[in-house]
Amino acid sequence: MTTSATLFYRAQQVIPGGVNSPVRAFKGVGGTPVFIEKANGAYIFDIEGKQYIDYVGSWGPMILGHNHPSILSAVLKIAENGLSFGTPTPLEIELAELICQLVPSIEMVRMVNSGTEATMSAIRLARGYTKRDKILKFEGCYHGHSDSLLVKAGSGSLTLGQPSSPGVPEDFAKHTITCEYNNLQSVKNAFEQYPDQIACVIVEPVAGNMNCILPKQDFLQGLRQLCNEYGSLFIIDEVMTGFRVALGGAQSYYEVTPDLTTLGKVIGGGMPVGAFGGKKEIMQYIAPTGPVYQAGTLSGNPIAMSAGIACLNELKKEGNEQRLAMLTKKLALGLKNLANQHNIPLVVNYVGGMFGIFFTTQNEVTSYQQAIQCDIERFNLFFHKMLEQGVYLAPSAFEAGFMSLAHTDADIDRTLQAADIAFASLRSSSFS
């Protein structure tokens, strides 16, 4: 039994499922999760000392790579002054100013502790500001585990939501409308059915929780126009895409302006931070200047703020945005070319510092329904072949991969060498 297997057994005795977030349990790919002891740069090291090229990056935050010296020194310096004060600090102002500078649609921002908290608070604010109850989200998009957003589509193309988890009351979920990602007509139908009831539309601009699905041309702009027409707020969830698809977020890359934006992951530099922000008029509707309540014991934590400041200041440096995109493109095109050589049907989506691998005979993957038709068994085999060779991909066919600025061309070359071997071991037949 490996050390990881021993630890996983111990963990299952005291932690539900042995993990503190479900995808880490390797249920999607099978086998025993790898327990990590340390990380540096583009690499993670398991408890037995094996090194892996890491394309998970703590699920997105480690855009500079692990243990970046600028972040580490900033955190250690601030930690000497105290871990948490529960008061305003200059650091939270500095991070807020940085965010507003980099994301022009954000005129004011409120710090929270996670992406879930950010989306939950933004939804509450939208409901309070518009005095409407219903919200509209998209099938396959994930916005955290708050009750309003753990909702799936029911039968038919347009439906009131049904809970996707026990513990979410149907009476609560019925206020959530679920539409098809990249299908603007389904959204138009919803607005026509509930013209004065929808408080907001919330969307992942790049859907990173059904792997990596890019928006079709004019989809995001179409959502913006519909929200304008019906008086609903448009919320872009940039928890995953913020500062990663582009320095100004996916909204900058796709040239669309939301009313509210949610952030997380990258803005904490590896520390637990979330944020939501937008137009000043809307943000001033939140307490203490407005009636919509939101609070948090550790919001604006000085150590987390210092990590976020250091991270964003590094990202701002000339050439970093372009280099991140270049590395991602090299990996994505390399994987596609190798798959073609081995006669394995593969779609690779990518943008900025995100990518997604789909084993499928489809020409493109632009929707949830197309994503779930992909060959999950083949992905799982590929995942384990890569893991054996020291390449750590997301342990699920429905999670995006993440590039970091610590990755090098040599890392990409090593990854492609491993993929060549992995593809050779896969049969190119039996696709559904």
Swiss-Prot record:
Modified residues (N6-(pyridoxal phosphate)lysine): 265
The protein's annotated pathway: Porphyrin-containing compound metabolism; protoporphyrin-IX biosynthesis; 5-aminolevulinate from L-glutamyl-tRNA(Glu): step 2/2
Biological process annotations from GO: protoporphyrinogen IX biosynthetic process
Disulfide pattern: none
UniProt GO cellular component terms: cytoplasm
Protein location: Cytoplasm
Keywords linked to the UniProt accession: Cytoplasm, Isomerase, Porphyrin biosynthesis, Pyridoxal phosphate
Protein family: Belongs to the class-III pyridoxal-phosphate-dependent aminotransferase family. HemL subfamily.
NCBIfam families: hemL, PRK00062.1
Record protein name field: Glutamate-1-semialdehyde 2,1-aminomutase
Organism of this sequence: Histophilus somni (strain 2336)
Gene: hemL
